[in-house]
Curated annotation (Swiss-Prot):
The lineage of its organism: Bacteria, Bacillati, Actinomycetota, Actinomycetes, Bifidobacteriales. Zn(2+) binds at residues 14, 17, 36, 39. InterPro entries: AAA+_ATPase, ATP-dep_Clp_protease_ClpX, ATPase_AAA_core, Clp_ATPase_C, Clp_protease_ATP-bd_su_ClpX, ClpX_bact, P-loop_NTPase, Znf_CppX_C4. Pfam families: AAA_2 (PF07724), ClpB_D2-small (PF10431), zf-C4_ClpX (PF06689). It comes from Bifidobacterium longum (strain NCC 2705). One of its GO terms (biological process) is cell division. This is ATP-dependent Clp protease ATP-binding subunit ClpX.
Length: 472
């Protein structure tokens, strides 16, 4: 019986579709496999479709500035101008991130022009060409929107860190806080700037794509201002100007190699490539002495017999509102560093009324937090109005602002919280002005075994009225 002889056995063919090199335009051969131009085009289409889907999935749901502002109002008291500025800056930042994701996916999709198209590719070529044509006709198509990192100016305890935390919550992105004073130049003892990115990656549970949309708050940024004076050349400023130089690239946007564990000082570490263009950096600091620089500049501007000297009576927060890049440069920030923080917002010093509102009004106000803690033990915790105002007064005198409120309440309630779990008959604790000032202790209302529930509530009300009357 005769054998069928095939003369195509030695002819190179595509490993994927089986076509020979004579049936396709181009055949790319490898050591153990080959692929034709049609299969390559199909693979590119598949990858392009996945990129578009990934862009849609990874794009953040973007609340409008007014919605961000309303959310901040629920948790942050006062600072209206700062909240408005931050709402707009965050909206524009993540709008840019979403726009870049979409443009990147469309650019890859638009590059898939192949003459040997399959029927599926031919169907998809029309919208692809339409997008490409639309993009070529758009005069703004090649415009790149720069990052809008944020600089917060204001004294300690006015809510700079808390505002950044609230922004991360409303955007549902990873968030990390770092202290600029712990950062040093690469090669010196301390944390280098890549450590900040490593912490953000950990906050994102190792998800690089999610970390690339996170928020990093760098506190005490004023502490890395370059030193000035006669002795600047004696010792190297490893935690000042050098850190600013190291931060420039990641603030602007770069591909950084971030160690998954340990630090860059440990060799042979696994690293992740992180794109910092989508990371929002918020830098905050008290900038003590900056108001003097502004006042001096304004004084130089208005000289002569007809000069207006109203600037000498301006408050610090009013002076900070007039800060410009030259003032920050004279303070010690590099001009390049200032340029990468284009959005500047000033937070005003909090008043007694502001602190009183902070204690009671926000969704997670401190008073509500302690009331919830006491409620777990079945105890009703009450603060009189005079007590709340006394807490605010002490915080103002100490110069700690909102940051010091918790420590004052802790000190006031410490003995009560120590004894309370062992006292089964206490049903109400009343904190008055005297107990906040330390001249007395919080009032404990005990429940007698034979007292009906209705009479107990009356007794609680009477005791609270007596305390309020005594304070008045």
């Amino acid at each position: 019986m005769g054998r069928v002889v095939s003369y195509n056995e030695d002819v190179p063919r595509c490993t994927f579709c089986g076509k020979t090199e004579h049936q396709v335009r181009k055949l790319v051969a490898g050591p153990n496999a080959s692929i034709c131009d049609e299969c390559i085009a199909l693979c590119v289409d598949i990858i392009s479709e996945e990129r578009v889907k990934d862009a849609e999935v990874n794009s953040l749901s973007l609340p409008k500035p007014a919605q961000i502002f309303d959310y901040l109002n629920r948790y942050v008291i006062g600072q209206e101008n700062a909240k408005r500025a931050l709402s707009v800056a965050v909206y524009n930042h993540y709008k840019r991130v979403n726009m870049e994701l979409q443009e990147s996916a469309e650019q890859l999709d638009g590059n898939n022009g192949h003459s040997g198209q399959t029927s599926k590719q031919a169907k998809q070529s029309v919208p692809t060409q339409t997008r490409a044509t639309r993009r070529s006709n758009d005069p703004l198509a090649d415009v790149e929107v720069a990052k809008s990192n944020i600089l917060l100016l204001g004294p300690t305890g006015v809510g700079k860190t808390y505002l950044a935390q609230a922004l991360a919550r409303v955007m549902n992105v990873p968030f990390v806080i770092t202290d600029a004073t712990t950062l040093t130049e690469a090669g010196y003892v301390g944390d280098d700037v890549e450590t900040v990115l490593q912490r953000l990656l950990q906050a994102a549970d190792g998800d690089v794509s999610r970390a690339q949309h996170g928020i990093i708050y760098i506190d005490e940024i004023d502490k890395i201002a370059r030193k000035s004076g006669e002795n600047t050349s004696i010792t190297r400023d490893v935690s000042g100007e050098g850190v600013q130089q190291a931060l420039l690239k990641i603030l602007e946007g770069t591909i950084a190699s971030v160690p998954l564990e340990g630090t860059r000082k440990h060799k042979e570490q696994d690293v992740a490539q992180m794109d910092t263009r989508g990371i929002l950096f918020i830098c905050g600091g008290a900038f003590v002495g900056l108001t003097d620089i502004v006042r001096k500049r304004l004084g130089r501007r208005e000289t002569g017999f007809g000069a207006n000297w109203h600037d000498a009576d301006m408050k610090d927060e009013e002076l900070l509102e007039q800060v410009n890049a030259d003032d920050l440069a004279e303070f010690g920030l590099l001009p390049e560093f200032i340029g990468r923080l284009p959005v500047t917002s000033v937070l005003k010093e909090l008043t007694v009324d502001d602190l009183t509102a902070i204690l009671t009004q926000p969704a997670n106000a401190l008073i509500k937090q302690y009331r919830k803690l006491f409620a777990v033990d079945g105890v009703d915790l009450q603060f009189t109005e005079q007590a709340i105002r006394a807490i605010a007064d002490i915080a103002i005198k100490q110069g700690t602002g909102a940051r010091g409120l918790r420590s004052i309440i802790e000190r006031t309630l410490q003995d009560t919280m120590f004894q309370l779990p062992s006292l089964d008959d206490v049903r109400q604790v009343i904190v008055d002005k005297a107990s906040v000032e330390g001249s007395s202790t919080p009032k404990l209302l005990r429940e007698a075994v034979d007292v009906p529930q209705g009479r107990l509530k009356v007794a609680q009300s009477v005791l609270l009225d007596r305390v309020r009357t005594h304070e008045a």
